[in-house]
Amino acid sequence: MTAREGSVGGTPLPRGTALLREPLLNKGTAFSAAERDALGLRGLLPPRINTQADQVSRVLENFRRKPTDLDKYINLAALHDRNETLFYRVVVDNPDEMMPIIYTPTVGQACQQFGHIFQRPRGLFVSIEDLGRVEAVLRNWPHRDVAMIVVTDGERILGLGDQGADGMGIPVGKLSLYTA
């Protein structure tokens, strides 16, 4: 079995809907027939198998139909939450179109609307209530192989003033650019 079909580094992959909810591993409709069988995905996805290029084309078509930059930001955030590989392929292949959406200027508006557009947690929130427990909070991060972090206190986000936890869009956006 390939890494996608059974395990990564000896760790078994999640199966079925658990795999489809894991953005680091989910390939959406790009899972092959063999992968669908091995990973319990048959019947959980539309039967047609798409290439990543097909998926990119569909993402761009949907993205370009969005009426506002904030709608485009929400669309890309949802993709990021579903399929990170596809998200980064779209960003890398279309930087001029994507960068102003995932970072400035749109990320400022996204931070201001964070409480209204929040869909899935990204990042690690450390607050004053965590005083004396920061190490325990850091241990809650699910990934051990961390190559880079971006930290903000939420103050003076893009000249917008103190955004507090709503400023999380800044480190998420920066890491998206650095990763791409």
Region annotations inferred by a language model:
Residues 2-180:
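Metallocofactor- and cofactor-centric catalytic cores in central/energy metabolism, strongly enriched
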